[in-house]
Amino acid sequence: MTSIYHILDRIPAIYKQDMEIEYEYLAMQLIKSGKLRIDTNDCCNFARFTDPALNINLMISKEELTKPHLIPETTKLFQSLYKNSASDQKINSIFDNLKKQIQKLQPVKKEVTEMLARLFVQSAHPIVIRWLLLNKTEVFLTYSHNIGDMMDIVSWQRVGGNSGMQSTNGKDVAIFVSCGGNPFAENNKEHPSYGDGFAAVARLQIIAAQELGHFADIKRDDKGRQLTRHAANFSGTKATDKVRIARKSDIIHCNNLFNKLLNAGMKKQLEYETKLKFYNTNKINGVKVNAIKCMILIYKFRLLNYSSKNNLIFIRKFKTYKYMALMLEAMFKDMQDNLSPNAEVYKNKNPEIEEAIACIEALARVPQQTIKWGYLTTKETMHHLYKIYYNEVIPSLITSYNSFTGENYKRNLKKPKSSFFSKINIFSNKKLILKPVREL
């Protein structure tokens, strides 16, 4: 079973009037920072700068080369790369060459940039995005299926096949996210679970949520300096006891809960739904198919009744799916997969290091699973890790943010006031309505 990347608990906003005020502010700040690098296959907003002699490989956005408020910082960056030995003529030459690169590229439309920024910032708690902006973190978004197109050749050979990556070494921080398609194109009618449309929207947010989860995991002091991680030590060689125990408990709890539901009648419901799905796919009808539908309704009622008696409220969220039991099964397998990451990149001959990597990954995937399946489902299936992330990791970021900035941060859930006509999309500038995919 591979992780699911095409389902979201909520349809994210892509227009200003639908955004929470705080998220809209953060999206615009991300654009203003010049740190958002976008590659839509045919459009691009950044240029590549390399100097093999000094092993320099980096990307510079159009904004960093042209916006008056960013040019001094970009100049300072190049001066530091050359250890203040580069002449003004050398710096000007670098700027000119990069601008020529940019001019050859098809520019990313302002509307597309804004919508992508909105999708990205909604992938995490606002305090995570605030730290991302404070740290001047580079964000790379690509429509490709992997991040290789946005990296230098050395990095590409090492990790270019990944779908997302968050690199942190205390100095150079960058977040890479692949969409696997155009988020603003029509859904793929034959295969709606991948490619263009909502599948790309979901993939962007799910991968971003995980990478931002890694970013959030870093503990910072009152001056914003990175200290260690919540999940493990900074080198990722030893898990913290709290996260190690929480992960093991959640693995057991998730498996036990799934088995309880199977024994409560979901196993038979799965059998009937599997048959019905086969008949529907092959467009077969008849008395037998109708009988199967009746049996599914009976077992569905039993499962919902069992969930009510046992206070498993999250199960009710699945009752609207075409194949409820199949979706529940997929969710549990997805949770198990994310609690115990099994890819080759997470393997290590040292069991302690392998466990530390698993703990780092599992904690970072709490916000990913929350954005995918919803907080009720994630809180129930990843109970202990969920508590650590939202009761410790996020408050820790708020505390250090307040100390570092002198502010008193409070989450703002308000949305801009909207008229009746804008709510029903009449006389509005909305051109696109996201159509969620609710099937496996």
UniProtKB/Swiss-Prot annotation:
It comes from the Bacteria. InterPro entries: Uncharacterised_RC0048 (IPR020183). This is Uncharacterized protein RP034. It comes from Rickettsia prowazekii (strain Madrid E).
